[in-house]
Every structure is written in C-alpha cells, then in structure tokens.
C-alpha cells in the first residue's frame, strides 16, 4: 500500500492529482492561452486590415497579449526559487545533506542550478525552495507548482528543498494535489523566463522525462 501524504489526506475536498487530471489541466491552460491570443490577436488583425495605417496600434495591442503569455510563464518560473550560493555554515551543511539525499547523479546539477532533480511516475520533477516544476513524459509540457514548508521560514534553503523532496518521494500524486499550480504550458515558454543559471536543470529534466525510468 502506497503512503499518502498527511497534507493531502487533510484536504479531502481536492481531487487527487494523477495522469487524467494533469492532462485535463494542461488542456485548460492551452485553451486559456489560445483565448488570450484570439482576444488580442483577432482585433489587432482586423484593425490592420480595415486601416493599414493603424498597424502600429495593432502591433501594440497584440504586444499586450504576448506580454500576458510571458507573465504566465514568468509566474511559474518565479515560484520555484532555486537555492542560492551557500555562505553561512548552516546553509553549507544543509546543502551537503541535500546533496547526499539526491544522490551522485543529481548532485552536480543541484550545485550548478540550485534545483533538485527527481524522477517520478508523473514525469521529471525539479524541486526548489518554494515550489516544483513537473516536466511531463515527452518533455513538451510543464506544470509549475507553488508549495512551501510549513513554518520553514527559518530553515536553511537546503533543508526546505529536502523537506519538499521527501514529501514528493513519499506521495507524488499527493504532492501535486496539495501544491498550487501557477503555470502549465510548453517547456520552451518556461525556459525563456527562468534564470539563466537554472535553465540547464530544465533541459536535464526534459531529457529525463523523454527517457523515462526512476
């Protein structure tokens, strides 16, 4: 019998996350993005067709729609919060323990990007201090989740990531149930908005999601 995350059990009103719910949420976010493009793009195209001299105005209007799409992905990228450079002794100790937890294969990626890679049934996860990114099998779509460690404000960054990583390992679907989704979309959209330092982690997670395995 699989372990159930206590936080997920305490929220019975939330439908438990799984393959079906992730696909459904992905479609909803896709339709939402298409709706934004249509809402801003169609009037802009119509205005340019009616009055070609109004093309600059149409371009500005369309630019607002593109900005909304970027803001969506930026929100997802900003919610994860990679580990920074460990300077205090407690931070270095926590980061060392986290390195032991993730194992040899992911330790170097953690040091370089500040994100911990974890393979799962639902895809490849990247865990940060305040959230996680799920790269779905195939590597084309991501789901970004915001979740924090309860009363973890005083914990070193490495400990916060370790708490989330252990919760993810205990109950992957429960973790996705408890966490709040703040973005879902194409992997490249998230990559554009991520800090340059963290981008290699997303590429590695995408490669992992394509090869499968745990």
Regions of interest found by a model, annotated:
Residues 115-117, 124, 131-137:
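Short polybasic amphipathic segments
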Residues 25-49:
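Canonical alpha-helical transmembrane segments of integral membrane proteins
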Residues 45-61:
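Hydrophobic alpha-helical transmembrane segments
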Residues 6-9, 63-123:
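N-terminal topogenic membrane-targeting module
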Residues 1, 14-15, 103, 158-159, ...:
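Short amphipathic alpha-helical segments that mediate assembly, nucleic-acid/protein binding
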Residues 134-214:
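Cytosol-/stroma-facing membrane-proximal "stalk/adaptor" domains immediately downstream
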Residues 12, 25-30, 52-53, 65, ...:
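Non-catalytic accessory regions used for complex assembly or targeting
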Residues 1-27:
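Cytosolic juxtamembrane N-terminal segments of multi-pass membrane proteins
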């Amino acid at each position: 019998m699989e372990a159930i995350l206590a936080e997920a059990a305490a929220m019975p009103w939330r439908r438990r996350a799984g393959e079906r719910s992730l696909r459904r949420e992905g479609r909803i976010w896709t339709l939402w993005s298409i709706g934004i493009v249509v809402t801003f793009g169609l009037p802009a195209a119509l205005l340019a067709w009616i009055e070609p001299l109004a093309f600059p105005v149409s371009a500005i209007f369309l630019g607002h729609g593109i900005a909304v799409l970027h803001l969506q992905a930026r929100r997802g990228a900003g919610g994860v919060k990679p580990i920074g450079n460990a300077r205090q002794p407690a931070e270095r100790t926590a980061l060392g323990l986290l390195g032991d937890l993730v194992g040899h294969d992911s330790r170097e990626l953690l040091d370089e990007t500040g994100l911990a890679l974890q393979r799962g049934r639902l895809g490849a996860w990247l865990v940060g201090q305040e959230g996680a990114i799920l790269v779905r099998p195939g590597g084309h779509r991501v789901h970004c989740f915001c979740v924090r460690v309860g009363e973890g404000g005083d914990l070193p960054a490495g400990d916060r990531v370790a708490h989330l990583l252990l919760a993810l390992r205990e109950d992957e679907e429960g973790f996705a149930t408890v966490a709040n989704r703040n973005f879902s979309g194409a992997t490249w959209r998230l990559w554009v908005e991520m800090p340059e330092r963290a981008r290699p982690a997303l590429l590695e997670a995408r490669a992992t999601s394509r090869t499968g395995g745990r």
